[in-house]
Amino acid sequence: MSDREHLSSEPYKGVRDFYPDDWSKLTQVFATIRNTLESFAFEEYNASPLERAELYEQKTSEEIVSEQTYTFEDRGDRKVTLRPEMTPTFARMLAAKRREIPFPVRWFSIPNVFRYERPQRGRLREHYQLNVDLAGIADMKADGEIVVIAHTLMKALGAKDSDFRIRISSRTLLAAACAATGFDNEEAIRIYSRLLDKKSKLSIAEFESALGPTRSDPLKAIESGEDAKVAEEKKKLEDFIAALKERGITNVVFDPEIVRGFDYYTGIVFEIYDTNPENPRAIAGGGRYDNLTSLFGGDAIPCVGFAVGDVTLMDFLETHSLAPKPQASADVFIGTPSESDIGPASLFGEELRTNGLRVLVNKTSKGLGDQIKEASRRGITYFIAFGEQEAASGNVRVKTLESGEEIELSKADVSGHVK
């Protein structure tokens, strides 16, 4: 490589570099997520991003598998995929240890996932995705708890009920409506489900053309409720929504057009939508999937869960002015009037660290004025100039940089003041 040929400093298209301020904001959101889920007794898990490609070829959306996965052959001629989602991995892990782990399983993870798609607002080729799953309970009370957890998480992140809407439907209701309107096999229902999932992106004419002239739209069967099975499934869903409202979730609505794009859903499905017109999109989604573990042999394990991508979540938080600010890397900056003061100042810094403070000690030849500017630029709250006088007297002046206020304290009292 010649001197004129330099490597690009840009990241791969569609992925991000997280500089400290960016990572600080994201990790604060992750901390809120973890605290919320742990309050519901959920346990965190993780797995490798590399999976056998066949894991996704069975039940993941055909569009994702054929057009959006990073799939390749390794040096052992095995077909490998960078995970585009976590749910199949969760099902695989569940099936592998089903006789060893206690049920019901309450797990969550925040892995990075990969999809080869056109980068745009809310979509990148790599992102972090919260996955929350409850396995081993077939009763709809589990579905209710999952929706409650999703709602609680949004509130924990600072959102008001008016900021988002939970839109709910049911795959069993849709299947009943399809059967009532002549969609008489699974493949026909699957094709219609995929069409319905894209309806918001189509004109009325385009949707009706794709449906075909001989087909009656199952949505009309749901609306009328004349078919007995459709009416039965619709009543179950209405009762489910009523139970959520009794628990204080008032921003939940029935929306028969919600189907979710994955083939493995079998029951309740839901999406959380931003109500702000500046960001009209889904933030999160999930539902019940009772058959996915049967791909690995043995009886199916009933499961329900939801997922939230960090890109859409941060867009939501920023749209509603809820995004956290970067946290400072230190509580205290200890400045040194001269280079000879660095040693004693470092010892004082060690004392403060043993008391639980995060401390940055100047190691440069900068003047105190420049050190104060550095501390301010880093967002550090307190500044202490530590020279010969402070080392001899045992007292220091603690300056609050934002207000300029100073207070004199003994070295022993600094930790209590800063905390």
Regions found by a protein language model. Give the residues of each.
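NTP/phosphate- and nucleic-acid-binding module
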Residues: 1-3, 24, 80, 236, ...
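Extended, charged alpha-beta segments that form solvent-exposed binding/catalytic grooves
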Residues: 2-251, 256-264, 271-279, 291-297, ...
